[in-house]
Amino acid sequence: MMGGMSVVEWLLLGSTTLALLFQSFATFSVPLSNGVTLSHFNGYKFGVFGWCDTTHTHCTPLKLGYSAEDGFLFAGQDELSLPTQAKYSLSKLLVVHPLALCSMVVLWLMVVLSQCYKHSDRRLTIIILWSFLTYMETLLCFLVDVLLFVPYLDWPGWLMLVSAVLVVFSSSIACLRRRTLTSQRIEKGAKEDLELYPLYGGALGAGVVSDSESPHRPYTEGSIISVTSRASSRLLPSASELETPREELTLMDPSIKCHIERSPMS
């Protein structure tokens, strides 16, 4: 559970949480939030879903993108001008902000669920792949904000760059965690092999079990017969071993000496 998380797991969860928070600042800007803006210029405050007039506190309806005719919606207003010479059609790309936020929410949920349950290579691989998609969307958000509002880009726009860096950092942490799990699994398998070696090592050294027969694989009836026959063949002496040369045996009593001729066994 989350109470026993390691430092690496805390870093992964913390980086994704901060990235989600920073993206929320930029997405929920004016007119959703009057105090948070992507840019302010010439009496206007710009956000993802519209803009507001700071003088008369008027805001456009919620929509994606800006239009030059928006300034004439209120009496006494001039034509709306963007901080840069970018075309108004480029402001339609602000749609990547809510898309990136949704991807970030999904990434954050996957990280939280991975902390609550046992880690697996599959879950971490999905997190790594999804974080790459989230990073591309977050970086695109920052580029759109730069093209539209630089040099009047406010701090929520710059937080998108920080969020992109945090997504890369969290992806690196997930890669490190996945590599650690793989190494632990390999070490565990090697340890189990060492523990099983006293059980099967003697049989392998005596030639009872061939190299092709893994000790982890259960024996079939045919393999048992094969192993038994090979074991019996090694236990029975060969014909050459049965042949014993003639030996001269000397009795313990030095006064009696006899030569006993031992004939070879047939």
Curated annotation (Swiss-Prot):
What InterPro entries does the annotation carry? pH-response_reg_palI/RIM9 (IPR051380), SUR7/Rim9-like_fungi (IPR009571)
Chief location of this protein?
A: membrane
> How is this protein situated with respect to the membrane?
Multi-pass membrane protein
Q: Name one GO cellular component term.
A: cell division site
Question: Which residue windows are transmembrane per the record?
Answer: 2-22, 93-113, 124-144, 149-169
What role does it play? Required for the proteolytic cleavage of the transcription factor RIM101 in response to alkaline ambient pH.
In the record, the note on similarity to other proteins reads: Belongs to the palI/RIM9 family.
The protein here is known as pH-response regulator protein palI/RIM9
Instruction: Write down the species.
Output: Eremothecium gossypii (strain ATCC 10895 / CBS 109.51 / FGSC 9923 / NRRL Y-1056)
The major lineage groups are:
Eukaryota, Fungi, Dikarya, Ascomycota, Saccharomycotina
